[in-house]
Regions:
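Radical SAM [4Fe-4S] cluster-binding motif and immediate context
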Residues: 67-169
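Glycine-rich beta-alpha loop elements in corrinoid/cobalamin-binding modules
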Residues: 1-62
Length: 169
């Protein structure tokens, strides 16, 4: 993963990497490319120039409101991979982050990298998660929901109760 192994930019076949979250800055990069603007100063990105030099941009702000970014376009996976589409277990995320410093986990390094760029723990609303589950269920085979958070039980007060009430419906 380029966030933790940014030296992969030195590989012959790599021209750019995104470190950290990409939703905000990838869109910014695309807009700059579409408008023929200088894109080499896009936060979260490292670029390899034609002369081989590497531009290392700083980390930008984290996405604090996880309801804002568009949800993953699952058609990109499920419409091209029959085995993924047929698998009944689908993954969802309700939070990002973890406050703990377990030595075997990446989160302590990620928290150090992104310190000062936003809240360590970020959450989606229950309604947003339920809406995504419903959308997937309406379009794909779904018999098991896997909420793939780094730490599922660490939620704002009342979140789990609200989810437990709304999910069965």
């Amino acid at each position: 993963h380029p966030t933790y192994s940014p030296d992969m930019i030195e590989k012959k076949y790599v021209d750019a990497i995104c470190r950290g979250e990409g939703e905000i800055y990838f869109l910014e990069l695309i807009e700059k490319l579409e408008n023929n603007e200088d894109f080499y100063a896009t936060k979260n990105f490292w670029f390899k120039k034609e002369d081989g030099s590497i531009v290392k941009n700083p980390i930008g702000d984290l996405v604090n409101n996880l309801d804002e970014p568009p949800r993953p376009d699952r058609a990109l996976m499920y419409d091209v991979d029959d085995s993924l589409r047929a698998r009944g277990t689908k993954l969802f995320m309700a939070t990002r982050g973890c406050p703990y410093k377990c030595t075997y986990c990446f989160n302590h390094a990620y928290n150090k990298l992104t310190k000062g760029h936003g809240d360590m723990m970020r959450y989606r609303s229950v309604d947003s998660v339920i809406e995504e589950i419903r959308e997937v269920k309406d379009n794909y085979f779904l018999d098991r929901v896997n909420i793939d958070d780094d730490i599922f039980l660490l939620k704002p007060k009342g979140w789990l109760e609200e989810f437990a009430e709304k999910y069965p419906k």
